[in-house]
Amino acid sequence: MIKKRVIPCLDVKDGRVVKGIQFQSLRDIGNPVDLALFYNEAGADELVFLDISKTEAGHDLMIEVIEATAKQLFIPLTVGGGIQSLDDITQLLNHGVDKVSLNSSALKHPELIRQASEKFGRQCICIAIDSFYDKDRKDYFYTTHGGKKLTDVRVYDWVQEVEHLGAGELLITSMHHDGMKQGFDIEHLAKIKQLVNIPIIASGGGGNAQHFVELFQHTDVSAGLAASILHDQETTVEEIKDKMREGGILVR
């Protein structure tokens, strides 16, 4: 049985870690390098670093900050945000990044997924999907540019396509749950997992340790992402893992 992962997420804007609710009302959390070191020592299984400032403007990769962050870690580091090309991916991997997360660029240029997986190995390629539930259409649709632009692409179709193109992992953020701390979108995540065979990281809604237990008891996702509850010290990685053990879930 595969051990489940708990992954802190650093949403970085202009060199600072920020957090909001449903992608809005961002507030400053701290220095990404300091937080990376903290979570590395706190028992995190991996770390996700998302440069959300690059969803609005195509500025250069935040290489210095990313490299400084990677040097603090003895756990895998995934970086996403504004990655547009194989050269961008090469640069990140050469500066200590273990996996890259593609979002809007994957939808714009789906062949980038195939090219990247063939060049670097699919284990390096994570596809991030910001999923929005449209009440009128009663379905989930893919959003781009940090959740600001709604597309007509059904999430359930897109996850299957990116797996076929060579994605090695999915990072699914349920936008209507993001920052709400009311639990993960269990039904949505379970349905996605039925459609694909690659690992899924669940994001959006984790408000306490019990929510992670429920996530892993009711879905077969591989990992749960946490941000504000860890940044605000409402719980810790170890408390989440202890609760998971009590629930009979294997942890690393």
Positions of PLM-derived features:
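Conserved, mostly hydrophobic/aromatic
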Residues: 11, 39, 47, 79, ...
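N-terminal beta-alpha supersecondary unit
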Residues: 16-60
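Hydrophobic faces of well-ordered beta-strands that scaffold small-molecule active sites
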Residues: 4-10, 19, 47-49, 77-81, ...
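Conserved anion-binding
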Residues: 12-14, 18, 93, 97-172, ...
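Active-site-adjacent beta->alpha loops and helix N-cap segments on the catalytic face
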Residues: 2-6, 54-71, 84-90, 104-126, ...
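Catalytic cores of alpha/beta
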Residues: 73, 77-99, 187-224
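Short, acidic/polar
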Residues: 28-40, 84-91, 151-161, 209-212
